[in-house]
A protein has these predicted regions:
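N-terminal presequence-like segments and the immediate start of the first folded domain
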Residues: 2-82, 92, 109-154
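Intrinsic-disorder/low-complexity, polar/charged segments enriched in Ser/Thr/Lys/Arg/Asp/Glu/Gln
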Residues: 62, 101-103
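Residue-level signal for inorganic ion chemistry
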Residues: 87
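Phosphate/pyrophosphate-binding loops at sites that engage ATP/ADP/AMP, CoA/4′-phosphopantetheine
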Residues: 90-101
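Active-site loops and adjacent core secondary-structure elements that bind or stabilize anionic groups
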Residues: 106
Length: 154
């Protein structure tokens, strides 16, 4: 009788180990077949050589957009409107929107432009705007008066 119980336990124990191993193998295979968590978004065709940075990258359902500047002449209102318009286009191309922005960082060439930038900025993100930091920064590319980057969800 003891031998039968021992054999039965050994059989059940072996079956449990085999099932656990199969479950791990299956979940590992599914993870390998799953879509990658990281996806790169570009505003143009893929460059022939690796660029210095990516315009946008999503990881899971989070989307990170690089800073957007204005390369044309104009005052802070023109530059802010342009940057926010480009951000809106990039968000929508990635399946997001201004209302889904969680975090925004604004870099101003001159903090004296804060009030004028805010006039254009306010209301662009819907009724519940994202968290934001605004900093003075020298050397913004292309002589832009503002650079804005965002983190959103898709």
């Amino acid at each position: 009788m003891t031998t039968r119980k021992t054999n039965r336990r050994a059989l059940l124990s072996g079956a449990a180990v085999a099932m656990a191993g199969a479950a791990v193998s299956t979940s590992t295979a599914k993870a390998a077949d799953a879509a990658p968590l990281k996806k790169v978004y570009r505003t143009g065709p893929k460059p022939a050589t690796p660029p210095a940075y990516s315009t946008g990258i999503s990881f899971g359902n989070l989307l990170f957009l690089s800073g957007v500047v204005c390369r044309t002449p104009g005052d802070i209102k023109v530059h802010t409107e342009f940057a926010l318009g480009e951000i809106k286009k990039q968000l929508e191309a990635a399946g997001s929107s201004m209302e889904k922005v969680l975090r925004c960082t604004v870099f101003l060439a001159d903090m004296k432009d804060f009030a004028a930038m805010n006039e254009v900025y306010t209301g662009k993100f819907g009724d519940d705007p994202p968290t934001r930091s605004t900093l003075a920064a020298s050397g913004i590319p292309a002589n832009s008066l503002v650079e804005i980057d965002v983190i959103a969800y898709i």
